[in-house]
Amino acid sequence: MKKTLVIVAHPQIKESVVNQRWIEELRKHPDKFTVHEIYQVYPNGIIDVAKEQALIEAHENLIFQFPVYWFNCPPFFKQWLDDVFTYGWAYGSTGNKLKNKKIMLAVSAGIQSKDYSDTGRYQLSLNQALYPFELTALYVEADYQPIYAFYGTESNPTSEEVDQSAIHYVQKLILLANMTSKHF
């Protein structure tokens, strides 16, 4: 079985509580996960597209882990997507490298889950806010999976809450790697 590639796109990972803890938990399973921190790998912002594409091709599943920034992803991750998901590789008449590959978002959100609802402060769900990622997965014919989210990072979550989320996150990714049906 191929490993799962986790693309970590956090511009201030050293200040992150949740994303750092998730990375720690993932790194306990080097036989299952490759953790790839793009802000650390490319501090100058120049992406080695061929290297990134080869890394993706060498993995069965692709996880995008990032903090929600202004109801979107951090800017360098958007650049990474634009640069790496190229015509002829990710899409187009000969672009099929992501076809049927499982893709999932793992995000940390500053606001509470109640605010991400039809009746919440922003009147839309996190799935709705991040829908462009699902559309991207559909466009490249990947197998998009439900989002894994930790809400309320701005509300100083307890270390127990963060630890539980990290354990649950890794368990979910292990299940994802072992599943044969389309969604879990």
Language-model features, listed with the residues they occupy:
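Helix-loop-strand module that forms the ligand-binding subsite of alpha/beta enzymes
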Residues: 50-134
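Residue-level detector of anion-binding/catalytic polar loops
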Residues: 32, 62, 143
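A short helix->loop->beta-strand "cap" motif at the edges of active sites that frequently abuts
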Residues: 2, 98-102, 142
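Structural beta-sheet core signal
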Residues: 6, 35, 64, 103-107, ...
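Structural motif
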Residues: 42-50, 157-161
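A short beta-strand-loop structural module common to alpha/beta enzyme folds
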Residues: 32-45
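Glycine-rich phosphate/pyrophosphate-binding loop and the adjoining helix
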Residues: 24-27, 133-184
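N-terminal beta1-alpha1 ligand-phosphate binding loop
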Residues: 1-33, 168-170, 174-175
